[in-house]
């Protein structure tokens, strides 16, 4: 039977150096090799870095892979709009509250710029994560908010409005993503994006 295996990023299993995840990686590779033995199987990726990495690890043939350049968004919802004028630039970080998503780096950047009397508003919207060693605790987030380092918005049901109210959207994730939806949405609205040179963000 035809099989499609779709990836929105390879995740921490393929990027972490922790022993448990290294062991899980070996089991995962073995499972993918078994799946790939079906020549009617297609492995679908959001960007070429992930495709090349997994193809090398699993031994995929090129005709078994395809790159779709992101899952896409609805441009009728995320319509282009002119930037709003603000006294200081507004930067939006909207993501799950994980250290690896790069919020800590944005905080450090804000501290450095603030010491040089350069200011911006850092709006943070996102989902708190439980039972994850990589999670940023609510206590840390509220402490940043109280120090004026961030404007904590919590979980939002209307990210489009937050993007429209921003000048810049930042997602400095330190590990390979798929193609992050928030960056696609920001680009569609016409906002500058900040990200590290990692898979899916380059």
Give residue spans per PLM region.
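Nucleotide-sugar donor phosphate/pyrophosphate-binding loop at the beta->alpha transition
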Residues: 2-4, 12-35, 39, 74
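Donor nucleotide-sugar binding/catalytic pocket of nucleotide-sugar-dependent glycosyltransferases
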Residues: 29-80, 90
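Nucleotide-activated donor-binding/catalytic signature segment of Leloir-type glycosyltransferases, i.e.
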Residues: 135-156
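Short acidic alpha-helix that forms the nucleotide-activated donor recognition element
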Residues: 154-166, 188
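A short hydrophobic beta-strand element within the catalytic core of glycosyltransferases
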Residues: 170-171, 186
